A protein has these predicted regions:
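Short acidic-glycine-tyrosine-enriched beta hairpin
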Residues: 106-120
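Bacterial N-terminal signal peptides that target proteins for export
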Residues: 1-8
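Glycine- and acidic-residue-biased ligand/ion/polar-headgroup-sensing regions
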Residues: 87-90, 94-99, 104
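Bacterial N-terminal signal peptides
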Residues: 8-17
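A short, N-terminal "cap"/entry segment at the start of jelly-roll beta-barrel domains
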Residues: 18-67
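Histidine-centered metal-chelating micro-motifs
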Residues: 80-81, 100, 116, 120-126
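Ligand-binding loop in jelly-roll beta-barrel domains
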Residues: 64, 120-145
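Conserved short histidine dyad/triad with adjacent acidic residue
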Residues: 69-86
């Protein structure tokens, strides 16, 4: 009888561990964090005084010890990221839409599949073009808080 109860108890403990919440909100070493657009979306003006309205998605902004920034931004028609000097390497990747990027005074079109690396000391800005939102991913090294 005792062995049967012990087996049932161990089975219940194992089953309960399967239904514990995953490490979504409090990452542990070797853990992970899952975030979705709907959870992090914020309507914001165009960054760096770029004008217009954008939707910013700052993924993993509260992740302790994370040394990089990973964002998505949807630039609505007429909006942009203002021309500014870059302080660290920054990568832009166009998911959808069209835009015009200006780096160090030279302008060029960006379309889906375009990746741009801006280096420290360069200056750049980005304007949405056309009727569709310009959706981009942005990745750069986190500055110490």
């Amino acid at each position: 009888m005792f062995k049967a109860r012990a087996v049932v108890f161990v089975g219940v403990v194992i089953a309960a561990s399967w239904f514990q919440p995953s490490a979504v909100s409090k990452p542990q070493p070797g853990g992970y964090i899952v975030e979705r657009d709907a959870d992090v979306a914020r309507t914001e003006p165009g960054t760096h005084k770029g004008g217009g309205e954008t939707v910013g998605y700052s993924f993993f902004a509260k992740a302790p010890g994370l040394k990089m920034v990973f964002r998505k931004r949807a630039l609505q028609p007429g909006s942009g990221i203002g021309y500014h000097e870059q302080k660290e390497d920054e990568i832009y990747y166009v998911i959808s839409g069209r835009g015009v990027m200006t780096i160090d005074g030279k302008s060029f079109d960006v379309t889906p599949g375009t990746a741009v690396l801006t280096r420290p000391g360069s200056s750049h800005g980005l304007k949405q073009a056309g009727n569709e939102d310009l959706v981009i991913l942005i990745n750069y090294e986190q500055t110490p808080r």
